[in-house]
Amino acid sequence: MSISTNFFRLPNMPITSAVLTQLAEQHYHAYLSAEQVKALCGQFQLSQIDFALACLPIAACYSKAPISEFYVGAIAIGESGNFYFGANQEFESVSIGQTVHAEQSALMHAWQMGEKRITDVVVNYTPCGHCRQFMNELNSAPTLRIHLPHSQNNALHSYLPDAFGPRNLNITDCLFDGPTQTTQPVNLTEAAIEAARSSYAPYSHLQSAVALQAGERIITGRYAENAAFNPSMLPLQNALNFYRLQGETASISRVVLAENQSKLSKKESTFALVKAELGLEAEYIAF
């Protein structure tokens, strides 16, 4: 089911209509700039957080949950003031462990867009332990605030006391501290390699990324590692999440995975999901 079809299920409210109008003008890219947020907060006389809470049903429309049928929306707020929407993404044909959680979705959306720091995460259900651990990898983890419909302004570490994270492993440059892509690659292979070089992998040092060809657009997803390993974001999931949140409708025709030489490889899991989800044979580049 298309994302725009999901919007028809939303209640007919002025604030919902105003946000959907903005999204429609940008081809349903699930993002609001700081300027758009400021204008809409002023129009409806809402604080930034109350406005984000009102946007959660819209964010949840980007969910793809054929297994659980449990639709979670999240919004990551950058220090820029930009809103990055996210939603859970499930894949029927592979391990359930490859699911993208809504908080991960929103945070990776922000990371892919070049945001440097997240101040707040707004979500319509209490974060699970997996997401709490994932958020603890952020450079803003010590000050990150979590907001729920029933409870606002909660410190991340109130959900994750005595937390284990990158600082326990003497990692000082955390997720969102690293480099971002700075050029526009001319082809899919170059795009995958350049994205891989911007991976966050301080534990394995694996540089890994996927590039998707969707019509005339190239969409990439980078590997983002976690101190606890299991909550790490795989590059294909990151790319597919970004594809969906961009509002893309063009079919994916090619997939390239690029990796450096490392103790790890995401080749097997990536190829399996590409075959199961897209019906394609992925291409592999070692650099």
Where are these regions (language model features)?
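Zinc-dependent deaminase catalytic domain
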Residues: 1-130, 134-287
